[in-house]
């Protein structure tokens, strides 16, 4: 089987905690995922939610664990290049699917993504990576940013709710021998961190370590609806 990634891309992922992958996904996959989201919105799972608290305004929507419910998502899980990409990034012989989800931010939505790392939302250990696949061309200021090297801090942070207000869930504590701390104030101390961010065309993606902090750096309001699919 031919390799998909270069050694430099793998090195970037391991050292920086996130890597930009150019044109790894055919436009047909993008269209299938967009169709899948449309189907999901018209017939959502019990886990579907809006993170926007106000009613009758542009919203920030999400659904997850729906790959087995939406044929387009299931096909992507089994047949897209991502399983091989993940295996190459993590030097793994076998890849397990932990979670699938999608986010859609409607044009004009004032809701944003809080800074968080995904590892806090899962009660498991192991080496994990996450796909961030935009389904529309996305400029740097329209997507999320990643805090370079934060996956190597050897820290766990409390979960942050995506709903407007971004409430931190719980208090500092030790769970299963791991200390969970308050998330750092990234937005209030932007000069202390180095951020990774990219303009993405269709077919481009970012893959990041489950421990890498990421979120919205500014409060830009999109003038078009933006969606992304993650695994």
Residue locations for each model-derived region?
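Short, charged/polar surface micro-motifs in flexible loops or helix N-caps
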Residues: 82, 92, 107-110, 136-140, ...
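Non-heme Fe(II)/2-oxoglutarate
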Residues: 41-55, 159-164, 202-207, 211-231
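Non-heme Fe(II)-dependent double-stranded beta-helix
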Residues: 1-16, 22-115, 121-122
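Acidic, His- and aromatic-enriched active-site or binding-groove loops in soluble protein domains
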Residues: 117-132
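A short hydrophobic beta-strand segment most commonly corresponding to one strand
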Residues: 130-133, 148, 224-231
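Short, structured patches in soluble enzyme cores that scaffold and shape functional sites
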Residues: 101, 117, 133-137, 146-148
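Double-stranded beta-helix
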Residues: 140-213
């Amino acid at each position: 089987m031919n390799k998909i990634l270069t050694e430099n891309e793998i090195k970037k992922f391991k050292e920086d905690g996130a890597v930009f992958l150019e044109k790894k996904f055919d436009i047909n996959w993008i269209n299938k995922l967009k169709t899948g989201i449309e189907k999901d919105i018209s017939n959502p799972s019990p886990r579907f939610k809006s993170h926007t608290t106000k009613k009758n305004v542009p919203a920030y929507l999400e659904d997850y664990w729906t790959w087995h419910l939406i044929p387009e998502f299931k096909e992507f899980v089994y047949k897209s290049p991502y399983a091989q990409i993940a295996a190459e990034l993590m030097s793994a012989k076998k890849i397990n699917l932990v979670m699938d989800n999608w986010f859609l931010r409607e044009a004009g939505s004032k809701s944003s993504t809080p800074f968080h790392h995904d590892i806090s939302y899962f009660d498991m250990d192991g080496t994990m990576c996450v796909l961030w696949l935009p389904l529309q061309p996305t400029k740097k200021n329209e997507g999320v940013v990643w805090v370079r090297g934060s996956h190597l801090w050897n820290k766990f942070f409390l979960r942050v709710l995506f709903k407007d207000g971004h409430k931190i869930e719980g208090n500092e504590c030790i769970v299963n021998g791991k200390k969970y701390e308050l998330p750092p104030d990234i937005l209030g101390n932007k000069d202390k961190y180095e951020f990774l961010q990219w303009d993405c065309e269709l077919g481009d993606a970012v893959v990041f370590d489950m421990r890498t902090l990421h979120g919205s750096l500014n409060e830009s309001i999109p003038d078009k609806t933006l969606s992304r699919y993650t695994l």
